[in-house]
């Protein structure tokens, strides 16, 4: 009978211990990603209440959205690589602290500047999480199934926004302290995630020198990707513009055009566009990438048209149903466009290209939101929505025209 090999047994136990530490890190990182983005989604259903109770205008609300978006973008561009030098855990902890501080600021809102400060802090938290915490998830995900890490890293942030928005809407509706309850829940969730990250003693990236040099933004569109960037930018701008419109005005849309100030309805309106986007990314995998870009952008344009028509008809089912289709088609078109660009470049060019994609997307959301906010002072939102129809149609026609010219 063969004697057991003590060295092999010790090696197996060591591997199991490392896998256990890694899995705890994966759970902590995943919950952190949810917590940070849930905190950013929690205030959205309260925007109409802020407008009425604090005397804010729709223009003020759009400023809050623009400030949030630019905070995400600036943090992502400047600090996007910092966790490669300081480690995943410290930067994830910083993201959680910023998210909790943003929620704490919004606990006692008393004016526009407080709202903007809270949203900037939450935006900075999301910028750190979108880089460091997503990388933390990828680094600690179990090896099997092989798709789990990528699926978690790319989709959990959207899930967090939806959970935060729906949870914030429900708490604002059911709690005697509608403005405080969503923020307190967000703080509790971020503290729980923070404790789990501290307890997860495995950091997949050690501290090393060079952190200051990493603060230089790397934004580049490699030569090989440039023929595709115009069409892809049309998708990025038109789809993210609609998301920014909903983030700024969904509660006001619900109150003015759908006949209810219930924050749960406002949350459903926002979630109808944001929630289906990860499913659209999954659908894209079943469609050839070039066709997916065209199908996604054309379907998106029709869905935005239906949303605008639903606003004119004051139809909640049409607005929400069309929002679901818009979110799904956005996921299809956006991921197809990103995939087409990445397929044209080498691995060492991914970081600069992804920074360029992020910059186009966030600016494409922030600038139309700012313009819409100023127009909302003199125009009805349903009229402004037709401008987004034109933007979506322009994006679809641009893609069709470029594809027709190159075939």
Where are the regions a protein language model picked out?
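A late C-terminal transmembrane helix in Major Facilitator Superfamily
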Residues: 330, 337-384, 388-389
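Helix-loop-helix hairpin linking two adjacent transmembrane segments in secondary transporters
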Residues: 144, 148-198
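Helix-breaking motifs and short loop linkers at transmembrane-helix boundaries and internal kinks
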Residues: 55, 87, 108-113, 310-314
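C-terminal transmembrane helical hairpin of 12-TM major facilitator-type secondary transporters
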Residues: 291-335
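Transmembrane alpha-helices of Major Facilitator/SLC transporters
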Residues: 265-289, 303
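Paired small-residue
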Residues: 102, 113-122, 317-325
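Cytoplasmic helix-loop-helix junction between adjacent transmembrane helices
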Residues: 118-157
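Conserved MFS/SLC helix-loop-helix module at the cytosolic interface between two early adjacent transmembrane helices
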Residues: 73-112
């Amino acid at each position: 009978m063969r004697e057991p090999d003590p060295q092999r047994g010790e090696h197996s136990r060591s591997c199991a211990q490392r896998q256990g530490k890694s899995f705890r890190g994966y759970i902590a990182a995943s919950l952190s990603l949810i917590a940070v983005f849930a905190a950013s989604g929690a205030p959205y259903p309260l925007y109409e209440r802020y407008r009425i109770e604090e005397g804010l205008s729709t223009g003020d609300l759009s400023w809050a959205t623009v400030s949030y978006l630019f905070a995400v973008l600036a943090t992502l561009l400047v600090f996007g690589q910092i966790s490669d030098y300081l480690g995943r855990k410290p930067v994830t902890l910083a993201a959680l602290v910023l998210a909790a501080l943003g929620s704490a600021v919004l606990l006692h809102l008393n004016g526009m500047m407080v709202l903007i400060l809270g949203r900037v802090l939450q935006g900075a938290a999301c910028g750190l999480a979108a880089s460091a915490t997503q990388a933390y998830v990828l680094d600690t995900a179990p090896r099997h199934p092989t798709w789990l890490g990528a699926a978690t890293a790319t989709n959990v942030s959207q899930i967090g926004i939806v959970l935060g928005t729906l949870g914030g809407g429900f708490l604002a509706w059911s709690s005697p302290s509608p403005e405080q309850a969503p923020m307190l829940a967000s703080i509790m969730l971020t503290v729980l995630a923070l404790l789990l990250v501290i307890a997860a003693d495995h950091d997949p990236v050690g501290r090393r020198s060079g952190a200051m040099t990493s603060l230089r933004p790397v934004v580049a569109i490699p030569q090989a990707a440039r023929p595709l960037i115009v069409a892809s930018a049309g998708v990025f701008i038109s789809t993210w513009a609609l998301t920014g419109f909903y983030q700024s005005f969904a509660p006001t849309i619900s109150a003015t055009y759908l006949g209810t100030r219930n924050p749960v309805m406002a949350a459903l309106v926002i979630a109808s566009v944001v929630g289906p986007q990860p499913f659209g990314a999954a659908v894209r995998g079943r469609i050839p990438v070039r066709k997916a870009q065209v199908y996604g952008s054309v379907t998106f344009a029709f869905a935005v048209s239906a949303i605008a028509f639903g606003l004119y008809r004051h139809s909640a089912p049409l607005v929400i149903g069309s929002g679901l289709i818009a979110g799904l088609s956005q996921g299809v078109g956006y991921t197809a466009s990103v995939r087409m660009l990445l397929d044209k470049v080498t691995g060492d060019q991914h970081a600069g290209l992804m920074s360029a994609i992020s910059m186009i997307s966030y600016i494409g959301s922030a600038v139309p939101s700012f313009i819409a906010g100023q127009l909302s002072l003199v125009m009805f939102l349903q009229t402004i929505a037709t401008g987004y129809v034109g933007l979506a149609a322009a994006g679809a026609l641009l893609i069709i025209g470029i594809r027709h010219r190159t075939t």
